[in-house]
Each structure stands twice: as C-alpha cells, then as structure tokens.
Amino acid sequence: MTNPITDLANSDCILVIGSNFAENHPIVARWVMDARQRGATLMVADPRYTATAWASDIFLPLMPGSDISLLNSIMHVIVKEKLYNRQFLEAHTTGFDDLCSAVENYPPGRAAKLTGVSEDKIARAARAYANAPASSIVYCMGVTQHVSGTQTVIACADLALLCGQVGRPGTGVNPLRGQDNVQGACDMGALPNVYPAYQSISDPANRSKFAAAWNIPVDTLSPNSGLTLVEMTHAIERNEMHGMLIMGENPIVGDPNSNRVRGSLEKIDFLAVIDIFMTETAQLADVILPAASFAERRGSKTTTDRRVQWLERAIQPIGESHPDWQIVCGLAGRLGLRDAFNYDTEDGILDEIRRVAPSYAGISAGRLQNTIGGIHWPCPTDDHPGTPILYTNGFNKVDGRGVMKPVEHIESAEPTSPEYPLVLTSGRVVLHYNSGSMTRRSPALLKREPEMFIQINPETAREYGLVTGGLAQVTTRRGSLQAVVRVSLRIPPGVLFMPYHFPTMNQLTIDALDPTARIPEYKVAACRIEPLGEKERAA
C-alpha cells in the first residue's frame, strides 16, 4: 500500500475494485467506515453485490474480467471533461499523451457493453474520484487473479497519477494482501525472481552481495528466475522436478485445477510438508514436520501497509513442533549448509535483514519492541521514523517522475461457449479463511457455514430449473462438483459464485497465468450447471 490502512479514514473518495473488505479485511472496513461517516464517497466495483457494495454510494456491477475497460472508461471521462490534475501531471509524470490516446477508445457507451456498468455510473464515478480533494484506490485479489491482473494494477496507478491522487494523506493505490504477513514474505524474497527487498536476481551485483551475506560461492546463485507454485506442478508433470518442500500451504485445496495439482504431488519422488495441521496436502507427504502456530513463535511481521511489527510468543511450542525458521535451519544443517543458515535467534535473523535489505536497515528488534504500532518501511537508518506514505517527494525514477502506461482490455483465458455458457468466479466468505485448513476445524464456524454452495441469480436459476436448497452440479473443462444452490439477487445473470474454502472447489478453476506476475486466473472459468434429481442427490 502507498498509504497506511488507518489513512483511509482521511479519504474523501474511495474507489474499491476487486475487494470485499467488509467480509475479508474487516479491520480495513473500520477505517473506511470512519471516512464515510465523515462524508466520503465510497464506490465499489465488483461482479457481486457484496457486503462492501451494500455500504457504497456508487455500485459499479462489472462483469468478471472487465476491470481494465471500466478503469479506462473512467479515465476517458476525466480526460474528456478535463478533470485531471494538470499541475501534478506536468511536474511529476510522463506518458500523459499516450494515455489520452489509449483511453479515447473507451467511451462510456462502449465500456457499458464490455463491463455491464451503465454509462451514467461510469461518469459519476469518474467525477467523484477526480473532484475529491483526496481519493484512494483499494484493490485486492479480485483484480490480480486474472490473466490481465498486472495490466489492471497498472491502470489503477494510471488513474491515480492522472488526478494527482498520490503522495498525500487520504490518497494512493492500496492493495490488500490475501493473508497475514504475505507482505513480509514477499519483502523477504519469497518470490522466484528477487532477493529480499525486491532486489533482482538477474543483477550480478545483487548476486555478489547475497553470496557474501550467506557465505556461499557466487556461482551457486542462478541469474534465472525460478518457478511459481503452479509452474512447479507443471514441471513435475514434465519430470523436471523430483522433490518439494511445502511450508504452510495446502495446494491440493488452494491451487487452481486442483485435480492436476493432486496428480503432480502424487507423482513426485519426494514430498515434505511443514504445517500445524494434517491438511489434504500433508496426507500425501513422505515426511511431515510439525510447525508452531502463531501463538508459539516470535519475530517480526509486515502487514499489507508495509507496517513492520514484533510478535512475542504466548506459549512455548507444544510437542515436537518448532517455529518455521528453526525447521529450515535444521534442514540446512543436515544438508551441509549450516554456515549459510547460522541463525541463533529471531533477533539475529532481523539483523541480517537489516544488512541486506535497505528498506529495513533502520528496523531493529529493539525498536520494534518499543514502538507501538510498528514502523513503516522504507526506514533506512536507526533514527529514521519510517515512511507511512510513499511518493511524497517524487517517484523512484532517475527523473523523479511517475510513468503512465496505457493498457488495453484483455480477454479472459477461457471465454464462455455453447457447451460452457456461464461464468464461474470464486472468492471468500466471512466465516472461513483461505483453504479452510484452520476454519473448517472450528465447530462454531462450520455450524454457520457448513458446506460448499453455489450463488446464482434468480433469472439464471429459473432458466436451469434451480431453487434455493436444491442440489446442482457445476462442470468446467477440468472437473465437476455438486453443491447446494443459493438463489440471490447479489450476483448478476450468467455468473456463478462459489467459495474456495472447501476441498473440491478448485477442481473447477483454470491454471492459466498472468504472463508477468504468473498469478492464476481464479476469478473466471467457463462452466455449465444442471439440477440433480433425488437419485443423484442420494448417490
């Protein structure tokens, strides 16, 4: 996030796209509601009329995968009506003319056909965002989990730059991470193409720097990008990968095209899993290493708004469980790599982070333990207060200017067809979390949300002979599953919604990837649906 979560309370207009934070990030919702009570305009772009949309002033009910067309059309209106921030553009950006040429092709009339959002709502959203003194954009995985995800994020940044809505309180482009400490994991280099602090592995100077820090020969560090998890399962199929260590992940439930994932993990020569539960994935493992829960470990965590905080354990690890870092260091020692993993404490790990990650250089364990609310990176020195708001004095370019990059509408990987005429999209519900490894073990939560369901519009339900409480079968090119029907006006005709917290849902999703970020397209799959008779239900 360019701005802290708490700073959302200072916004005069908030455009939410691809996020249902009322259910999925309820703490974020608190600060947004503070802004609303102060008179801010809340606009929500989502295929479903979610709990977040319910609270909005302007609801933009777009079809799944049409986000770029909506954003480009909003910018079209802003350019046509000259609502952009000319002074900011001239002083702080490049690429304005190219952007204007691109968005010229997205008048509200055309965008309405591509997105399903009315011309009037597009124009109202554009004026509200551009005219507000401080406007913020908030997005989540409803934006990124598409083959067009990277391009959509660029469009969000273009919109913010166009109106000068960045670098000030209440403004910015603010992605919400999908789970606890994902920001911290990425900051630490848990990505296939960067070292900690997003330092590229292709840069020889970076490889030399980290080889020295880790006490290893520089030629052991590859300049080539590694694989994402989806790409790893494909590599197993090609016999290019023979062993895997999975930490705190349940890909058999959580990854797209999960039947294919299961086939790969059943085929691999060796599988080790580090987890606190016997997940569906752990059941396939050759070795299971019991991890400590959050209450049994200590160390730093980084939240979605770059806020680094210190966590102390509540109890000692139970049984044979250990914190993840101790397990990894133990494995490294057995593999003859002890010199590269010579950590004795969590504080010592953070000391190394400070040495190799410039954005963390001023963040010590001692400072965190004595700082209520944490410290926002970048924090380059011990006496630096941290940086809650980014880009207050320009951008990270040689000329200090933000670059506007026009993007075009990109079709989803799997369009509908006569055989698969409906669009399936997936997401979360308030009572469960990710693959359900934790929440499906809670009797109280299961009592309220016990099973998979299919949300469907009344018009589509009538067309296919479906009623609330009935059982239906949903089929895609990758598999079929049965679930209970919930007829609802909260979803548009032609679209089905299913939560992904249950073991079978991702049998249906497609593992097509965004070509840049290599994130799979969970949010769009072509499908069909049919009611099941009594005999089929009994079976």
Residue ranges, per PLM feature:
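Glycine-rich oxoanion-binding loops at beta->alpha junctions
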Residues: 1-14, 222-233
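A short helix->loop->beta-strand "cap" motif at the edges of active sites that frequently abuts
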Residues: 35-41, 266-270
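Long, well-ordered, tryptophan-enriched scaffold segments
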Residues: 39-43, 48-132
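Flexible glycine/proline-rich, aromatic-decorated loop/lid segments
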Residues: 48-51, 276-312
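N-terminal leader/propeptide and maturation segments of large enzyme subunits in energy/redox metabolism
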Residues: 83-119, 196-221, 315-387, 424, ...
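A glycine-rich, hydrophobic/aromatic-adjacent loop/helix-cap motif
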Residues: 129-234, 305, 339, 380-385, ...
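Long, contiguous, secondary-structure-rich segments that constitute the structural scaffold
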Residues: 318-320, 324-372, 435, 440-455, ...
